């Protein structure tokens, strides 16, 4: 799932086609009706009305476009979902909705979610485990509670102390 919900969707494709594209690549043997059924199910799972099936990305809000990206990423039932700053381009109320949605689909699809972010308050509130990177290298890895309560590396300590966090630990 990408950071820019608009930029990650082909503006010439309908929402249904965007979501079904991975099926065209990895499950070519499916009939059109089967693909449509899978797309509509994925849309429902992310809170999108099937009335959006034949619409285009420019007709949707940023939050709806991000839900399209999430539906597209779920269409082939992955075991791992990589989210690259998936809420940073969204306003706060939509951020909360998308984060709640990710939590729901994590359980429903039995997913491991790799959540890439610089926003420590979000990391603190949704992640079970945190890996801190500096210049592409891992400087610390721990469960979220321990990492925020007792960071070991100097870099992690500086990182945590540089950003006030209003969200308490889980």
Where are these regions (language model features)?
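A short, proline-enriched helix->beta-strand linker immediately N-terminal to the Walker B motif
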Residues: 75-79
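Hydrophobic anchor residue at the start of the ABC signature
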Residues: 70, 98
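ABC ATPase "signature
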Residues: 141-142, 150
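A short, surface-exposed alpha-helical micro-motif characterized by mixed small hydrophobic
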Residues: 123-125
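Conserved ABC ATPase signature
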Residues: 56-60, 64
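Conserved ABC ATPase "signature" region
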Residues: 33-51, 160-161
